[in-house]
């Protein structure tokens, strides 16, 4: 279980309050698929991902970015039970979808870049530290089934 200070909880909540899931979700997934092209292999049914423009203009990528970020947002309401919150999703990604668990980390890195771009100087080092702790807890929970 991850231990959270009151300040860390406030910082994570503050970051989430600045995130528009419908904007940041697609941007984070688009960035992940472009920067780390090997992650595209899990999205073959999404159609054309052959160019950056195709990825950015792909409505299935955008929709899945919203789904992924909505799922990531779930942890905010369950910060004291992140592992159990993501247990079923971990099983799905490991046993059915066979997703490399490192891809969760890559997506979260891309999300952090998107969030930093949106928040600018308002994303203080303390906020970023709490945000990274939150993302690491979720990534660990999603990868738990792989261990």
Curated annotation (Swiss-Prot):
The GO annotation for biological process reads:
hydrogen peroxide catabolic process
This chain's protein is named: Hemoglobin subunit beta-1
List the GO molecular function terms.
haptoglobin binding; heme binding; metal ion binding; organic acid binding; oxygen binding; oxygen carrier activity; peroxidase activity
The cross-references to PANTHER family, in alphabetical order and at most eight, read: HEMOGLOBIN FAMILY MEMBER (PTHR11442), HEMOGLOBIN SUBUNIT EPSILON (PTHR11442:SF7)
Q: How does it assemble?
A: Hb 1 is a heterotetramer of two alpha-1 and two beta-1 chains.
Q: Which UniProt keywords apply?
A: Heme, Iron, Metal-binding, Oxygen transport, Transport
Q: Does the keyword Membrane apply?
A: no
* Binding of heme b, residues: 64, 93
Keyword Cell cycle carried by entry? no
Q: Where does the entry say this protein is expressed, by tissue? A: Red blood cells.
């Amino acid at each position: 279980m991850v231990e959270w200070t009151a300040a860390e909880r406030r910082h994570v909540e503050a970051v989430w309050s600045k995130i528009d899931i419908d904007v940041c979700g697609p941007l984070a997934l688009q960035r992940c698929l472009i920067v780390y092209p090997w992650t595209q292999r899990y999205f073959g049914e999404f159609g054309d991902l052959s160019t950056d423009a195709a990825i950015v203009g792909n409505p299935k990528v955008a929709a899945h970015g919203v789904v992924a970020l909505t799922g990531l947002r779930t942890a905010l309401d369950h910060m004291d039970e992140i592992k159990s919150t993501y247990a079923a999703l971990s099983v799905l990604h490991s046993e059915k979808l066979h997703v490399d668990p490192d891809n969760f980390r890559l997506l979260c890195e891309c999300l952090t870049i998107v969030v930093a771009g949106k928040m600018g100087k308002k994303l203080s080092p303390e906020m970023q530290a709490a945000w990274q702790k939150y993302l690491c807890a979720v990534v660990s929970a999603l990868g738990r089934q792989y261990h």
